[in-house]
């Protein structure tokens, strides 16, 4: 099964090492992909050269393995339509400035058939009303791994 961590999971790992115990369980059971939107957000959040090198080190293995998923034109349209439909129902995401980026990550997950693991289940759950994306919280996902 394909797996994507959204930006929030990568940030939590960089700050608190949350993937330290999860990654050994993921290997061999999932095909982990890096979303190029998440990669761009991580790079944009870097304030120092050291941080940029750290993020480059995170991205490089995915590039070498050919496991970076980048939005296509169809993904942009699918993401924009989902946001438009969401707005038409009166719903909004908690961070409207990042709404398109989140919707693009969801569209990427749909295209590659990946489970999207996030700390932002509320917003991705809203997107799932208009995009057939499978979403799990990081906590639920890691508990599932521990029980397997």
List each model region and its residues.
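Acidic catalytic patch
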Residues: 66-93
């Amino acid at each position: 099964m394909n797996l994507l961590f959204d930006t929030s999971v990568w940030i939590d790992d960089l700050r608190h090492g949350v993937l330290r115990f999860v990654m050994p369980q993921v290997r061999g059971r999932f095909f982990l992909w890096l979303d190029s939107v998440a990669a761009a957000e991580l790079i944009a959040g870097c304030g120092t050269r050291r941080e940029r090198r750290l993020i480059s080190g995170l991205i490089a293995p995915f590039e070498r393995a050919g496991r970076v998923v980048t939005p296509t034109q169809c993904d942009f349209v699918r993401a924009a339509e989902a946001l438009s439909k969401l707005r038409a129902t009166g719903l909004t995401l908690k961070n409207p400035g990042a709404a398109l980026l989140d919707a693009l990550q969801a569209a990427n997950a749909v295209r590659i058939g990946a489970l999207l693991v996030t700390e932002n289940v509320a917003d991705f759950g809203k997107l799932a009303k208009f995009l057939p994306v499978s979403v799990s919280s990081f906590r639920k996902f890691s508990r599932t791994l521990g029980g397997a």
